[in-house]
Amino acid sequence: MKAKVRILDMYSGRYSVFINEKEAKKAKLHPDDLVKLETGKKTVYGSVTISNLVKEGEIGISKDVLQLHNFSEGEVVTVLPSGAPESVRYIKKKMNGEKLRKVEIETIVKDIVDRKLRDIEISSFVTALEINGLDMDEIAALTIAMAETGDMLDIDRKPIMDVHSIGGVPGNKTNILVVPIVAAAGLTIPKTSSRAITSAAGTADVVEVFAEVSFSLDEIKRIVEKIGACMVWGGALNLAPADDITIKAERALSIDPVGLMLASIMSKKYAMGSQYVLIDIPTGKGVKVETVDEARALARDFIELGKRLGQYVEVAITYGGQPIGHTVGPALEAREALQALMSGTGPGSLIEKATGLAGILLEMGGVAPSGMGKKMAREILESGKAYQKMREIIEEQGGNPDIKPEEIPIGDKTYTFTAPTSGYITAIDNKAITGIARAAGAPEDKGAGIELYVKVGEKVKEGDPLFTIYAESEARLDQAIVFARRAEPIRIEGMVLQRIGNI
């Protein structure tokens, strides 16, 4: 059938096209049927939503579809039913526990990107990976397919370094120090980062406090070839586009298949042209990987996958049992990171981790002798060279290179929790800290978050401040206070834990 495009000023939350009920009956189309829209220039796929938002002879295009494909109001398109793609058969094959061939994986990924697969079919694929897993042949094929269906970056400055943390630790502003340290040593490090999904601040959220983070690949290439580094939001790029689609299914199902996680991370490194990749795997209670044994197994997978992609990969297993530094939330973390770069010093957990990771990269890149990377990284930080490189990054990304930490605005609604008793800090709950910061409005409210005054092992007296919540509104502050009282994020105990009498 022929139909005129009507642009709908709405997001449907899915990749849908809207057809009038009478029109759908005539065309024998049903809800969720896959259709293709053909014009002289392109073919676009979408799932049918039957709605009287559009009239007979019209097809409604939501903003979800417009984000990827250009349509004009009133443009005439041909609407045709589309049968189930071949990739559905391959998904069923994986559901049955069978190994997928390279061409089958490539077909699935291409159909995900082209939107030939509907949400339910993508969810089935993700579930099959969670239940039946992928071997390394399949993971490598999936990684390359995810990268090659998107844009690829080609930077002339070599070698190209990269670092990625699998996350889970609140306050992880480490890479805001690592990137300028590594670039100040003469290595190239184009860092793409994510925004927060379940955390209180992704690296991109923090960097955005003092610089722009959304750039095209051409703009990134220009910045990196000029100054050797960038810190940008990966979501603004068409890198491994299948990943963004499958992540939605993972979130909805609350699952994270290991093979898909490996492919998700490494496909973007492959697309960025990274030659040397350092993976940071934090371990500890309340993070994604809780034991060192789990971390070692995952490390072996990353290293093996890197070999198959032609990348040299090393893994750092790091302590993730409590927040890094003293702040959680975009603006608060930006202040702390900038202060550390300006002064060359800062909280021990932040400086130790940042110089440790940067040192490994300096050794991997051949600018520091084996075993001397951390010392060199600390010297670069303390000399002010890393801060000068950070100023260049901020300026090239459209920010003010002269900005001072105290000039970064933070929430003006605050509440401080104090120690209810004297004793020692025996635990800080990562998930609770993140939950409080998010309840306060982070990451959407840049000035929201938490400032911690204590760390595990420290002694406190009754009435000593433990942490302050920052919010941009009274309502958000009240919400965070209620959450904090319920969550009890900091545990204080005396040296005598329990007294037991005669039994």
UniProtKB/Swiss-Prot annotation:
AMP binds at G168, S194, R195, A196, I197, T198, S199, T203, S264, K288. The keyword Endoplasmic reticulum does not apply. The keyword Transferase applies. One of its GO terms (molecular function) is AMP binding. It catalyses: AMP + phosphate = alpha-D-ribose 1,5-bisphosphate + adenine; CMP + phosphate = cytosine + alpha-D-ribose 1,5-bisphosphate; UMP + phosphate = alpha-D-ribose 1,5-bisphosphate + uracil. The active site is at D256 (proton donor). It comes from the Archaea. One of its GO terms (biological process) is AMP catabolic process. GO terms for cellular component: cytosol. Its EC number is 2.4.2.57. Catalyzes the conversion of AMP and phosphate to adenine and ribose 1,5-bisphosphate (R15P). Exhibits phosphorylase activity toward CMP and UMP in addition to AMP. Functions in an archaeal AMP degradation pathway, together with R15P isomerase and RubisCO. Belongs to the thymidine/pyrimidine-nucleoside phosphorylase family. Type 2 subfamily. This is AMP phosphorylase. It comes from Thermococcus onnurineus (strain NA1).
